[in-house]
């Protein structure tokens, strides 16, 4: 299914059932893109485990509202480099320089 691998940017819900958690995570990560991922669960251990394993910049758990002005917006892989929004977004417009002086 192309909607699994392409960012379609439309009002589409790509829903599928999986036999195992590992199968679901593998299918979600089988793409060269990784802007956002979404899943539903009531199991806190599973929520943290799956959220860490998903190769995407934003994860929505039981919610689709992952983009607000105070949260970092950005993806992994070919879905963008860097973050917009939040204090992390300011880092994209900054140049950090270390100047180390030895004994003068």
Q: Model-found features: residue ranges?
A:
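Conserved C-terminal structural/oligomerization subdomain of aldehyde/semialdehyde dehydrogenase
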Residues: 1-104
